[in-house]
Amino acid sequence: MIIVTSNDIPGYKIAAVFGEVFGLTVRSRHIGSNLAASFKSIAGGELKGITQLLHESRREALARLAAEAEARGANAVVAFRFETTEYANTGVEVCAYGTAVGIQPIQ
């Protein structure tokens, strides 16, 4: 599965468009991460617990997007993006979205 942020893929032509696909995950923060974030906001520095939460959430959302695209018969996703939303300082939603397409190498 090729997943790109651009609207085309060099060396390939888009032979079929299967439509918008997305992968979504909503995760709650660990209370320890919330406490650490409170202290770090005063002292400064990376919020490692939140960084890990976002990293894992993006990977899960991307995997779900790829699975949906594959289920529709696509072998690529173009115009790929992430969108992140925080919920009441207790959790985070990560949505990966793009357009599922069928591509063929240009001869």
Curated annotation (Swiss-Prot):
PANTHER family: UPF0145 PROTEIN SCO3412, UPF0145 PROTEIN YBJQ. It comes from the Bacteria. Disulfide bonds: none annotated. Belongs to the UPF0145 family. This is UPF0145 protein MAB_3451c. The lineage of its organism: Bacteria, Bacillati, Actinomycetota, Actinomycetes, Mycobacteriales. InterPro entries: UPF0145_dom_sf (IPR035439), UPF0145_YbjQ-like (IPR002765). Pfam families: YbjQ_1 (PF01906).
